[in-house]
Amino acid sequence: MATVKLRKALRMKGEKMKTDSRSLVLQGYVWLMMPALLFLLFWFRWEVALPVAALMVWSFVRLCRPSARESLQTEGYSPVSASRKRLLLMAAAVVAYVMVCGIGGFVTQLPNDHAWRNGVFFDLSRRDWPVAYEGDGAPMLCYYFAFWLPSAVVAKATGLIAAGDAAQVLYAAWGTWIALCFISSMSGGRMLWRVFLVFIGFNAMDVVTAFFFSDESFSVFEDPWAAQLMWLSTTSGRFAASANPVIYNFIYNQGIAVWVFMSLLMHGRRDTGRLMLLFGMLPAFAPIPALAVAPWVAWRLLRGFRQALTVENVAGLLFALLTSFFLLQNNSGSALRRAYPDTPVGEALLLAAAYYALSFGAFVIFIWRYVRRDGLYWSLVAMCVAVSLVGVGKTPDLAWRISLPAVVMTAALVCRRAAETAAMSRGVRCAFVAVLLVGSFSSVWSVVFTLHEESCVWRGERERKYLSMLGRIADPSQPYYNNFVATGDSFYRRHLAPPDIRSRE
């Protein structure tokens, strides 16, 4: 009897665990919908929030029904299969990567965006929702903060910011895991370490674009710990195509959501019956990247208009409209302008086309088989070029953020190609590896920089976590005040905000 049990245990240990694409789709929708529902229920009047929330929940219930199973299985996607040991090791590696990028503040945070991210999370955790402040113009927190809402609930429930920080790590790791599993699913279902390494190291050739487009000068030999060496993707003024570590270090509140969204979109792009539900949740996390996808989504919905008339799409449209009314009151977000007005439009577009050709061109050679007739991919690249003419507030943030969907889709397809290296000829494989290594310079450097900064923490030379903005988000003297607050009257305050917000202003 004992021998039989031992054999059974050994068989179970060697068994592979499988996850089909339906499970991944449901996980992706839960990941996006949890913060969306929290935002809806606490930032809007009950008579507005409850009907839309009910529609969104009903849409998810319809998604879970057995009758929807076939529509969630997409050709070209295989069940993800790996041993329990490999899955656990890769899950641990994902958590470690998220922590090394500074999310949660358990490993050294790099300068200096984390200071404001920590400040937003602190106010969401410590103040009543919607977050309002005292001061002229009745300021209130107005930012795309959906990423932090589940973690803020944990912090509120426990009374511990540290518990919320741990929840941030787990939520970020879960979103990353969903994206990696989708990549594995479209790569034959194999969970490969080389795919994971390409994922964390992907960089859109910023070492090349910085050489041609940046006015700054930096050298690894002159100042090896200059922060610009990992920020190369943001040193070219109006243009940017971020590295994945830059996304995870500085704009993770948007970037991880874009990874989950793009994974779902690439998988279910032909399903117009749920397209607006999926797209409608993105602006609460990442409104600027959502603009990059909007033209393609609009085209697909118009093309399949009859199939698009669904409860799911109505729910997504209503949620997107409510999110837009909230975000449009932001002091910076409502101020669009022409970026670099002294440059003629034609010249600016040529420069943008050259920049993004350098950013993505070397990778497109290897993923050409996937993208040559892919309207989604080329529309995302075209939006990168076109929106380089536009700025928001005082910074070129619109152009910097709008490239995220193109970067993410390129990275996902490059990861898929990395899973096929065994089928490449030796010459193609060597060229592919060379392109990845050249592109990964600042990605590798950001990890090296983090380890250096962590050693500084141990020596007592700096703090691990940026705390300078805790409780100061609504301080008008801080330089990015307008990015995070809304003041004065607005359509949202008059008609959509909960009535009790006036008593807290």
Regions found by a protein language model. Name each.
Residues 38, 317-505:
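Transmembrane helical bundles and short interhelical boundary loops of multi-pass, membrane-embedded
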Residues 18-30, 78-89, 192, 271-275, ...:
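Membrane-interfacial loop-to-transmembrane alpha-helix junctions, especially the N-terminal start
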